[in-house]
Structures are given as structure tokens and as C-alpha cells.
């Protein structure tokens, strides 16, 4: 059984017991979160596709912790003009463990 949820403007395919990183959520470590934006639920041959969400479907997850991804470098350069600009960015994330899929 798996589901597709929407979080932080992205869609994630989740399975019970899986850990995944989503955009930063305002929740304490150890807290339980419920996702109501379930776009699809697949249980064997039974497939439920929402329009836009599946009614009554929920995915619960436990917050493991928060962190930051690896740094990415943004480089701007104008050739022959001796202009170079560097910037770095580290995006915050929340790590979740999926505890249940219902619906």
C-alpha cells in the first residue's frame, strides 16, 4: 500500500515505515503530523485517485527532526568584464517517518 501526498508544493510517494525529507514544517521533534492532502491511494488492485484529493484519506507521520541540505553554489559571471559573484544556499528540511496510511 502506498499513497501520494502533497507537502511544500511538492508531491511525494510514501510507504508506511519510510523516512523522507520534506520542506520545513512548524512542528516539534517527536510530534505526530497528519496529511489530509492525499492525491492518490493504492492498495493492491484498489486504486483511488482524488479530484483533487481523496476524500477521507489521511497519512500520519512522526517528526524525526529538522536539518539543512548540502550547500549549493550560485555563480554569476560576465565574460571579459572581470565580474564574478558567488552565493551559497542551504535549504531547511523536516525529516519524517510515515506511521500510517488510511483511506
UniProtKB/Swiss-Prot annotation:
What PROSITE patterns does this protein map onto? RIBOSOMAL_L21
Q: Does the keyword Protein transport apply?
A: no
Sorted keywords for this record are: Ribonucleoprotein, Ribosomal protein, RNA-binding, rRNA-binding
Molecular-function GO terms, alphabetical: rRNA binding; structural constituent of ribosome
On assembly, the entry states: Part of the 50S ribosomal subunit. Contacts protein L20.
Provide the protein name.
Large ribosomal subunit protein bL21
Xref: PANTHER family: 50S RIBOSOMAL PROTEIN L21 (PTHR21349), LARGE RIBOSOMAL SUBUNIT PROTEIN BL21M (PTHR21349:SF0)
Q: Which InterPro entries match?
A: bL21-like, bL21-like_sf, Ribosomal_bL21, Ribosomal_bL21_CS
Q: Signal peptide location in the record?
A: none
NCBIfam families recorded: L21
Mention any one GO cellular component term assigned to this protein in its UniProt record.
cytoplasm
Q: Name one GO biological process term.
A: translation
The keyword Transferase is assigned to this record: no
Protein family (similarity comment): Belongs to the bacterial ribosomal protein bL21 family.
* Function noted in UniProt: This protein binds to 23S rRNA in the presence of protein L20.
**HAMAP family for the chain:** Ribosomal_bL21
Q: Name one Pfam family in it.
A: Ribosomal_L21p
